Regions:
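Bimodal "functional hotspot" detector
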Residues: 2-184
Length: 184
């Protein structure tokens, strides 16, 4: 009887050690997993930057001038980043920002060699230019996007719909090719 009590006590101690040992391993493994997660959360993704050309009219409205800009493309496409840079405008007093500040870019999509640029109605409503201004507005958009070699044509839409013209002077109902005549 004494021997069975000793064996039972030893078995109890042995089982306690086994359970405690398993628990300790699980805690260590759990800590390793937690550490890995924390390390991954603190990593920052590399911000990709590219150099592009953005086209602005000169202050005399006689030609478009290419301006080199470096833009971040993390979380967006290079085409949208280029349009955002065009919409930011320029600080150069010899150049003019042509897209109204109130206009909103709704999106840029590419299908084959054609980019579709969608603005809200603010582009039309707040644009103040005449026929030359409209030509430079369209030319700035088209030439900025066709500076990417894979883009050959640009379709400008308003609220997702094709429009005949922005202000009555220039047909934008179909995709437009690069406007090199404005670069003289």
């Amino acid at each position: 009887m004494k021997m069975t009590k000793i064996i039972a006590a030893l078995m109890l101690v042995l089982m306690t050690l086994v359970v405690a040992g398993c628990d300790k391993d699980n805690n260590q493994q759990s800590n390793k997993s937690t550490n890995t997660v924390v390390e991954n959360k603190t990593e920052k993704p590399a911000e990709e930057k590219i150099k592009i050309k953005v086209y602005f009219p000169n202050s005399d409205a006689t030609k478009l001038v290419a301006v080199d800009k470096t833009v971040k493309v993390a979380g967006t496409t290079k085409y949208k980043a280029a349009m955002d840079a065009l919409m930011e405008g320029t600080d150069d007093s010899k150049l003019t920002t042509v897209i109204p500040k109130q206009a909103k870019l709704l999106g840029v999509t590419v299908n084959g060699d054609t980019a579709k640029v969608d603005f809200d109605k603010g582009l039309i409503k707040h644009f103040n230019g005449g026929s030359t201004g409209e030509e430079f507005l369209v030319g700035s958009i088209v030439n900025t996007l066709t500076d990417f070699p894979e883009i050959k044509r640009v379709q400008i839409t308003i609220d997702g719909r094709n429009v005949e013209t922005l202000k009555g002077h220039m047909d934008v109902s179909k995709p437009l090719s690069r406007m090199d005549e404005l670069l003289k």
